[in-house]
Amino acid sequence: MDINLDPSRDDLPLMANTSHLLVKHYVLDLDVDFGSRVLEGNIVLFFGDGNRCKKQSSSSQETFQMESEEAYILRTAEPCHVPKMDSNTFSPKMGHREFAVFGKSDQDAFDNDGNHDNKEHDSESSSSKYCCDTGNHGREDFLLVLDCCDLSVLKVEEVDVAAVPDLEKFTKAPNLTAAPEKRRCEIVRDLVALPADAWREQLDCYTRCSQAPGCGELLFDSDKWSLQIRKKGVPTAADFPHAIRIWYKTKPEGQSVTWTSDQDGRPCVYTMGSPINNRALFPCQEPPVAMSTWQATVRAAASFVVLMSGEKSAKPTPLREGYMSWHYYVTMPMPASTFTIAVGCWTEMKPKTSPLDDLTEHTLPLRPSDADFRYGNTCSHMEYPCRFQSASAATQNIIPYRVFAPVCLEGACREALLWLIPSCLSAAHSVLGTHPFSRLDILIVPTNFPSLGMASPHIIFLSQSTLTGTSHLCGTRLCHEIAHAWFGLAIGARDWTEEWLSEGFATHLEDIFWAEAQQLPPHEALEQQELRACLRWHRLQDELQNSPEGMQVLRPNKEKTGHVSASGASVVKNGLNPEKGFMQVHYLKGYFLLRFLARTLGEETYFPFLRKFVHLFHGQLILSQDFLQMLLESIPENKRFGLSVENIVGDWLECPGIPKALQEERKAKDCSPSRLVRQVGSEVAKWIRVNRRPGKRQRRKREAAFEKLSPDQIVLLLEWLLEQKTLSPQTLHRLQQTYHLQEQDAEVRHRWCELVIKHKYTKAYDQVKRFLQEDQAMGIYLYGELMVSEDARLQQLAHRCFELVKGHMDKASAQVVTEMLF
């Protein structure tokens, strides 16, 4: 694998050799320093046996590809001189200047190899740097490879778990005749294998072991994408230390976290869904198969709130004057990419209700659904304390929740968000059953957040753009992110290129949840869903016209989907393409596929199946064929309408462009549009007539003729009006007044800004400027529209807005805009 891939252009390498050792638990211990914009401290990793030692499922056996292991064995080299350090007195605050000095020629070679240690320390390095000689010096050492990028690793050491008292209560009797190294490995193997009902004791053991002293430094090196660790004289993964501690600090420019200011102008830092995931936050195993639990202690100034994707609502512990410590944990194994942290001066927004009605503290009882227990209480995932086995969790339609935001957004949160949460959570439960996670925090993130929302275990990030206009955009986006609790988190894609398994499901389910949350009658729900399908059809056509064919395929690896190397390493195709984050093909084609299946097989068949699928596959990683095969096998052959896994994969997942079945469906809809779509068409015709006859008398005559439209209808209206070659300033002014466009939600205002730019409506240029500054999650493409207008004033507006926001803009977004402007 080429470790020198261009990080701005190529595929994303997943370097960790998970087939040899698997991280089972992480313990993070970090300090937040807003002055230097770094997180600093240590992380302890507890390992279990890798995938090569485990029996693969039949699905895994079909897709697991073995390659040569030669690239993952390091020939033993003579280490550079390493002065001894007392690990018990090591402080994470120690800078590089407290480490050993070695010759400049060695440092130059280190940098050329891709080391990311700070460049200013030309004559210094970590105490555990070793000289790598590819020549054969005799024995081979096992090399542990972790995914890592833009971290300053200071020290790596083995943890002496054997020094922790009373572990024998939870582990097998120690073999006192065995070597100390072997005893330590045996203790960790026993610890990670404790049963689910001993999770509290296991968590306590992890905590105490993470605080044990070091018992020897390990040799390490790093390149652009990984951290490599070895212990001299240890040739196999089985004998490699199973508990290691890594002292490190992040870098201000690291892409896993964003250091910025919130809407009140106060400093904050948060994980923003980077293409490189969390590897610039902590050394980890990135491949999704590396599912682990974790716990984290984070210290920050007392004025800050620390939020994380943890199972309990952490209460801060006072430390020295002016500082607090926050502790979170999870017991459900998840990929490291799902770890989320946000630190800022957030304020909890509480609904104004009586204590009995306060749904943030109480949950409403619901009759247990027979559907949730038809399939039995046996789960198919690895053992952990699972909510799907709990009768009380099955009846909990509204899980406890909290909302955090800057103080200046309190009014907007109360008006647009707080009252929606119970109905959206309850709607999701009515469709899919047991909530996979026990609680939910919702955070309104800073303006530079690059999307409308992001879901992680126990926490959802929402853009402030969702709080504008009516509750419609906020409700649909909240439903989308809630859906990810099941599809994307509780059930994940085993191959990250199959993004549709997360986004397609969430997009399809958001409409179902939202209709249920509004308690719409079936015919109104159907009308609303047909309207949104029409909108998505327009967007999909635009996406496919403006994207390369290679990025239109939902299963780009085809028959190699799910394949990894012998070590467990792999590559995510287009994972680092900055434009990919702004594409919606996986959302839209995935949505239309699921909609097609639900309509073809019947919703009365599809949604009960989906509930069953969730019950059987939660806590696991899947491929497309796992879902499709179970779906079709649950339906008698004479009711499958000729569908097969092969033709669905071939027509929908492995071909670019628009599937034939979708073309035929949309052609039929064009001939017979739904009522809400017809209503929009009628209004468009009125506006076209107004635009042709702009006289004052005609305007007055038709003033009351325009019907009230929903936000989705207004979006469709504006999209159709964008197809008109010219619209007069008078028509645009009247449009704005009729629908109060500047007060609508961000989706509507985005289309309005497109009209303003296309027709150079100067009176609304300030609204475009405001949108680019306050709605960065949606404004990227407007920069392109401004530039292709070939209007000097509009191009100047684009440059001015970019200058104002680029210092705080998401890096991928800034890169795309830079390419548009320069």
From Swiss-Prot:
Span of the annotated motif Nucleolar localization signal: 692-702
GO molecular function, one term: zinc ion binding
Cofactor(s) the record lists: Zn(2+)
GO BP field: proteolysis
Sites annotated Transition state stabilizer: Y587
Positions of the catalytic residues: E481
EC number: 3.4.11.-
Coiled-coil features, chain-numbered ranges: none
One matching Pfam family: Leuk-A4-hydro_C
Subcellular location: Nucleus, Nucleolus
Keyword Protein biosynthesis among record annotations: no
GO CC annotations on file: nucleolus
Enzyme class, spelled out: hydrolase
Cofactor, free-text remark: Binds 1 zinc ion per subunit.
Keyword set, alphabetical order: Aminopeptidase, Hydrolase, Metal-binding, Metalloprotease, Nucleus, Protease, Zinc
InterPro entries tied to this protein: Aminopeptidase_N-like_N_sf (IPR042097), AOPep (IPR033577), ARM-type_fold (IPR016024), M1_LTA-4_hydro/amino_C_sf (IPR038502), Peptidase_M1_C (IPR015211), Peptidase_M1_dom (IPR014782), Peptidase_M4/M1_CTD_sf (IPR027268)
Record: residues binding Zn(2+): H480, H484, E503
Protein family (similarity comment): Belongs to the peptidase M1 family.
Function noted in UniProt: Aminopeptidase which catalyzes the hydrolysis of amino acid residues from the N-terminus of peptide or protein substrates.
UniProt name for this protein: Aminopeptidase O
Biological classification of the source: Eukaryota, Metazoa, Chordata, Craniata, Vertebrata
